[in-house]
Amino acid sequence: MLYLIPTIVGMLLVLPLGRSIVTPFSEKYTSLATERGRIFFGLIVTCIAGAAVSFQTLWISSKVSEGGNFCSSNTVFSCDDVIGNAEYNVDPILGLPWGGIGAATFCILLYLVYSSSKEPNADWVTLHLKLGALATFTGFFVIALLVYYEIQMEKICQYCTTAHIANVAAFIGFFRLVRMNDSNAWNES
C-alpha cells in the first residue's frame, strides 16, 4: 500500500504535531518553516495521494469488469469484491464509478490548494479554501455510504480506505487553513 505512506505523511503535516516533523527540513525548504506553508505542503501531498489512489481504484474497477483479478482474496480485505461489485461500485444517482468521482474531486482539491499556496494573499483564496473545506466535508457523507456498502459485503477495500483517510486529512488541512485565513496568523512568517 504505497499510497498510504504519502497519505499519512500529508495528514501528519496538516496536524499541529507536523511542526516537529518538518523542523530538520525547514532550513532547506523555507516554506515548511511557516505553519501556513507546512499545511499547504501537507495538503498538496494528501491531494496527490488521494488522486493517485482514486485513479488506481478506477483502473481496478475497469480490470475487474473485464474479468481480471487484481487484489482478490478469501479474507475480509478484498478490494476486488468491493470495487468489482456492480451494484455498489457506482454512485446511485449518476451511475459514475466512485474511483472516477474521487479522482476528479482530488484533482479539483489539488487545484484549489496549489493555486492558493502560490497566491496566498489573492482575493479568491478565501473562496478556494472554503470550497475545499465544503467539498471534503461533503465527502464524509460519501465515505459513510461507502463504509455502509463495505459492511453489507463484509469486505474492506484497502484502496478505498486510503482514499477515505486522504479525505479526512484534506478536510483537516482545509479547515485549519480557513481558520488561519480568518485570523492574523495567515501572514505570520
Predicted region positions:
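Membrane-interfacial helix-loop segments of redox and metal-homeostasis proteins
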Residues: M1-S189
